[in-house]
A protein has these predicted regions:
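Amphipathic, small/basic residue-rich leader segments at the start of a protein or domain
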Residues: 1-88, 109
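Short glycine/proline-enriched turns and hinge-like loops at secondary-structure junctions
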Residues: 67, 131-133, 156-160
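N-terminal glycine-rich flavin-associated loop
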Residues: 85-105
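Short beta-strand-to-turn element immediately C-terminal to the catalytic PLP-Schiff-base lysine
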Residues: 99-103, 125, 165-168, 178-181, ...
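A short, Trp-centered hydrophobic/proline-enriched beta-strand micro-motif
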Residues: 116-127, 165
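Cytochrome P450 C-terminal beta-domain/meander region
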Residues: 132-148
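Flexible, small-/acidic-enriched active-site or ligand-binding loops
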Residues: 133-135, 153-154, 180-206
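A short core secondary-structure module
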Residues: 150-187
Length: 206
């Protein structure tokens, strides 16, 4: 099978390279990594306003670009080449997860938050090195839903306005929940990483 980029995809690569060459220099990366946030908020705003990369995987019906993983990977590869320090990877994960969810008002609102430049993080894996195991659980009693457990390796979770949590239901199926990281019973701690351009966090729920 022969694979080749379309003209539009090659243009996306070229514009991504040009933008990142101008904004993600070695000095800029080092300054972002050393900052309290771990990334440059002003640069993230430019990514959202000028490039609209946060909208690549968001469906057109939600005012996104409605593109696919080929286009997303083009941008992520360019970002990785330039060591772009930003919430882009976290937001791409979350947008991809939301596209697999039923169409609801909550889903639409979260897509809107992503397009507005909010950081929406995805808490998927348990705190161990086993990336295939979800630790969080959801229980419903007398109409009240309660999430408990932990999640590790949450990309940019410490800076997120919303966190999407994968959790086991009572019948052991999986569901996705949106939580406010500042609500009672939720604690998020930034965790040190070898790759300082990819800041991570640990999520606790009780």
């Amino acid at each position: 099978m022969k694979f080749a980029f379309t003209d539009e995809q090659r243009m996306l690569w070229d514009t991504s390279q040009a933008f990142l060459a101008d904004t993600s220099s070695s000095r800029a990366v080092r300054m972002a990594c050393a900052s309290d946030r771990g990334f440059d908020d002003a640069l993230w705003r430019r990514v959202c306003d000028d490039m609209y990369w946060q909208g690549i995987l968001v469906p057109e019906e939600n005012d996104g670009l409605g593109l696919g993983w080929v286009e997303m990977v083009i941008v992520l590869e360019a970002a990785g080449e330039r060591l772009l320090t930003s919430p882009l990877f976290a937001v791409a994960q979350s947008a991809a997860a939301l596209t697999q969810c039923p169409k609801t008002a909550c889903r639409d609102a979260l897509f809107g938050s992503i397009l507005a430049g909010d950081i929406v993080a995805l808490a998927l894996s348990n705190p161990s090195s086993d990336w295939h195991c979800v630790d969080a659980r959801v229980d419903t009693s007398e109409g009240v839903t309660h999430l408990s457990g932990e999640a590790g390796f949450v990309s940019c979770g410490y800076a997120a306005e919303h966190v999407l949590v994968a959790a086991h239901n009572a019948d052991d199926t999986l569901s996705l929940w949106s939580i406010n990281p500042s609500q009672e019973g939720v604690r998020i701690e930034r965790t040190p990483t070898m790759d300082q351009t990819r800041p991570m966090a640990h999520l606790y729920m009780d």
